[in-house]
């Protein structure tokens, strides 16, 4: 069952990264903010993928925790860009929602992995 959740999480994070790249494609004049958003959003899936091939359970947990931190950072950049009116709420609300879904899945996965560690 955990393997199915991990695969779903990997798939969701890949789709999420693609959606963020598409969302930011047309933004002009805010290179540094767009770069930060794209880096954190794509890092989520990269760390989830790395976790699948962790050397140990603690390494697995560490990779998921990094993905979780990147998820929180991505939410920050999305919210900032909304407040600064670089992204409209309408354009980014689904992306922000999806980020929250991934965040909650990561929290649950880390919790389960820590419980299984004991």
Language-model regions, residue ranges each:
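Amphipathic alpha-helical assembly/interaction segments
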Residues: 1-118
């Amino acid at each position: 069952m955990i393997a199915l959740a991990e695969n779903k999480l990997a798939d969701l994070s890949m789709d999420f990264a693609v959606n963020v790249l598409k969302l930011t494609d047309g933004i002009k004049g805010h290179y540094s903010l767009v770069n930060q958003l794209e880096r954190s959003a794509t890092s989520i899936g990269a760390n989830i993928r790395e976790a699948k091939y962790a050397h140990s359970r603690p390494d697995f947990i560490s990779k998921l925790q990094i993905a979780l931190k990147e998820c929180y950072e991505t939410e920050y950049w999305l919210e900032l860009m909304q407040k600064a009116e670089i992204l409209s709420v309408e354009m980014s609300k689904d992306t922000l929602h999806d980020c929250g879904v991934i965040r909650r899945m990561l929290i649950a996965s880390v919790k389960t992995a820590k419980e299984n560690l004991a």
